[in-house]
Structures are given as structure tokens and as C-alpha cells.
């Protein structure tokens, strides 16, 4: 199994798959917001930022997956984004399962002054909903609970890919017309 993760990590197809999966989740979030009329909360916006971090890691990995430095940089960005996204989504689930006046998220995102994403890209990062509202569910899980599952799966995959980097594997190249 580590062989598969190592092989995918040194090929562009693995990083492209990561990029496409993160962008598909972002597209799904935008569909829920603009197509179905669900309002994102501050925690939803923070989870989007974490997903964009994973997509950015996919772009870094696409640039030069055979170079160890680029691959490790992409893995670090992906791993940290998945960890942060997992912690944020767990807190989001806590807001939904234990709503109370003293256990609420803020209504305005707290981005750094040098990177006010909610001002620069309000279509993507402007929150309008409440964190304690669970207005959508599928198979008995709310959207925030599904995001916990998604970030946990991403984290496990990145952990396996990171461990696989220490395994020596022969990567067989396909025959090329030109060298």
C-alpha cells in the first residue's frame, strides 16, 4: 500500500487528483450556498480556507512532484491544512450539537489585516449564517459532520503519503519517444 502512495506522490496524476477533489468540494460548497440557498457561517468559511490550502498543496505538488523539496513542501501544506480543517470542523460540530448563548462563533471572520479574504473575495468568504444551525443532512450526518469525515480522510491519506516518502521504491518510467 505504501508503494501506491509513494508512486502517486511522485507523479502529477496524484497531485492533480488532490487538486480536483479539493476544488470539487469547494464547488459543492458554492452550490449549497448559491444553488440551494444555504448560508455559510464563519466556521464554514474557515473550512473553505482549509480546503483551499489543500488545493494549493495540490498545485505545489503539480509543479515538480519528482523533486523532494517540492513534494515535501506540498505534503506539509496539505497536512497542516487538513489538521487545521479537522480541528475547525470538530469545533463546528460542537457548536451544532451543544448550542448555547455562550458557545457561539462570531459573525465576522477574523482574518489577518494583511489577508482580508472576506473583503477581497466576498463571493467565497463572506459569512451570512449561524454556526449552530444544521439545516442540511445526509445519511444522518450534518454537513459539518461530513466535513469532519472528509478532513479525517484527507489527514489519513496525507499521513500514509508522508510515511511512504521514507520507503525506497523503484519508479518504472514508461517508454518515451524522446529522452
Residue ranges: model-predicted function:
Residues 96-142:
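Extracytosolic (periplasmic/ER-lumenal) interhelical loops and adjacent juxtamembrane/interface segments
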Amino acid at each position: 500500500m505504501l508503494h501506491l502512495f509513494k508512486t502517486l506522490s511522485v507523479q502529477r496524476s496524484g497531485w492533480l487528483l488532490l487538486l480536483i477533489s479539493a476544488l470539487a468540494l469547494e464547488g459543492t460548497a458554492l452550490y449549497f450556498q448559491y444553488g440551494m440557498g444555504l448560508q455559510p457561517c464563519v466556521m464554514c468559511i474557515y473550512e473553505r480556507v482549509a480546503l483551499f490550502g489543500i488545493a494549493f498543496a495540490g498545485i505545489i505538488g503539480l509543479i515538480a512532484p519528482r523533486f523532494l523539496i517540492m513534494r515535501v513542501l506540498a505534503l506539509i501544506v496539505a497536512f497542516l491544512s487538513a489538521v487545521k480543517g479537522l480541528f475547525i470542523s470538530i469545533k463546528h460540530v460542537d457548536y451544532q450539537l451543544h448550542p448555547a448563548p455562550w458557545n457561539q462563533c462570531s459573525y465576522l471572520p477574523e482574518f489577518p489585516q494583511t489577508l482580508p479574504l472576506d473583503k477581497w473575495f466576498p463571493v467565497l468568504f463572506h459569512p451570512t449564517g449561524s454556526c449552530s444551525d444544521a439545516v442540511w443532512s445526509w445519511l444522518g450526518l450534518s454537513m459539518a459532520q461530513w466535513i469532519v469525515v472528509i478532513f479525517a480522510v484527507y489527514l489519513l491519506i496525507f499521513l500514509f503519503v508522508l510515511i511512504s516518502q521514507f520507503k525506497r521504491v523503484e519508479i518504472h518510467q514508461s517508454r518515451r519517444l524522446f529522452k
